[in-house]
Amino acid sequence: TDALIAPIHERDLAAAIVRALLSDDLLSTAPVLTGPELVTQAEQAKLIGEAIGKPIRFERVDPSDARDHMAAQGIPSSIADSLLRYYERAISHPIEPTPISTDLVGEPPRSYRQWVLDHTADFR
């Protein structure tokens, strides 16, 4: 089973942060910000592949191998372990998309597909 996540577009996150900094709307709150839909890692890879015109597939790796790879990239073990726990939990307990993003941004949140289109050049 793949992890299900609701990735948030950085423009939506930035808009929510600006609102939080410039108003009192979010004082004493801790909103959970998400993108508008749940997607699997395989779906993410497929969308990136479609955008760049090359097939990309998601390949599941053993958590210890993933940890070793992250360590080789200079990622601290505490961060690597946190990421691995996040994705493991997202398999059985995905964080559902929240409407708070629309409320904070003032418009519907951007989809993962839109994020991919906005970042296509980054994948080439």
Listing of model-derived features with the role each one plays in the protein:
Residues 11-82, 93-124:
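Mid/C-terminal beta-alpha module of Rossmann-like enzyme folds, strongest
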Residues 1-7:
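Rossmann-fold dinucleotide-binding core
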